[in-house]
Amino acid sequence: MPSSPRTGAAERRGDQILRHRILCLTTDPAMRRALKRLMTAVGALTEFIADPSQVATASEDGPPSLVCIDLRAPELTLASVEAVFPEKRLICIVGGQDFAQISACLSLPRCGSVITYDDKFEPEDFIITVTKLLHGQIFGVQKYFPWGVTLYNMEIASYDDKIKALDVLCAYAELAGARGPVRDRMALVAEELIINAMYHAPVDDEGKPLFRHLPRKELTHIDFERRVKVSCASNGQHFAIAVRDQYGSLDKDTVVKFLSKGALAILEPENRDSGAGLGLVSALKTANQLIFNLAPAIGTEVIAVFDLDLMHQGHAGVRSVHVFTDRRRPPPPDPEPPRIPMAPMVAGALAVILIIFGIVGVVRKIQEGPPTMVSAEVPLLDRDGKTEEVPIKVGNTDLKLRLERKGSRVVISSH
């Protein structure tokens, strides 16, 4: 039934309120209804098409802000979306916990988010993802919790600090309701992420690892100049651990490389030269959400979110993986102080010394005696024997001149 003119006008006014537009490829009517409501919450208008051939119609209003594809439908594949606004970032929707499919999606340069859509779908995850992609503010575990949830922060500068931080995380996880086996798996993920931030993330100005070549025993005695920041929070159902370094050496290619190992039945031993190692695989198979916030040459934040209810039911492993990249430029290095040639400095110093000695000599000369000629205004000596005293000042020296009339002469003396 066609809509009335009044309804159409209301829809046009509503479209003007929403600043962003998201193009979604899906054949699922239920998903269309759900995503339309969710995207309205973030100020975005959602346009749906069922086939990539309909892109021409969808592009009449210009390119969208984001593209979303529902890979649960057999006819929709990663290859089919290659030509759909290839310059726009892509969110992939999958139907199950398929690590190989997750890695394949993230291997696309334009794709940074893979979300599972089933009966356990979490709307908040989709809202947070779209908001971060649209506005670019990617760091912070507080984005994954409602207002009012307490966030606990710690800083790690040594091996002993790491042990204390893990004790705090385990104690807080127990208070939050995590049972023994679940708590142990969460602690293992936390330790792996902290080790990556402490030992694998630090690099020099040329990007070469600082500590990766050192033996483990020697690493336990190092105090780190750039501290690792660890945060944790819980709302009773979700427990999150965030680990942040201050180097920003982790890139998306490395993340995808190690996440792809999650699809292997038998994991290879960790190669210490490989960087983040199998700790990321451990997080992939334990946490329910895994978020990588990357700021090249600035910092890396890895957030692992655990759904306590799902984990207690035996449903471990990621349901969504996100790799966000901060496009800020790294701060420029501090400029080197200008180098001044030594020869002019020496010559200038000698000149100053000579001037000082000259001034001292003049003062001493003044103090030795009055000058031979002094001009001053004196009263008229109109008779023989009349005397007058005239005060004068030479530099900082006060003198008095005595004038005496002797016949036709005037005798001047100082005292």
Regions found by a protein language model. Give the residues of each.
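Conserved acidic segment of CheY-like receiver
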Residues: 18-30, 35-39, 47-48, 56, ...
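Active-site beta3 strand of CheY-like receiver
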Residues: 62-73
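A short, hydrophobic beta-strand element within the central beta-sheet of small alpha/beta folds
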Residues: 67, 87-101
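Alpha4 helix (beta4-alpha4-beta5 surface) of REC/receiver domains from two-component response regulators
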Residues: 75-80, 96-115
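Bergerat-fold GHKL ATPase/HATPase_c domain
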Residues: 99-103, 121-188, 199-213, 253-255, ...
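Conserved beta-strand-loop-beta-strand hairpin that lines the nucleotide-binding pocket
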Residues: 144-150, 198-335
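Short, low-complexity patches enriched in S/T/P/G
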Residues: 334-345
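Ser/Thr/Pro/Gly-rich low-complexity linker/stalk segments immediately outside membranes or between
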Residues: 364-379
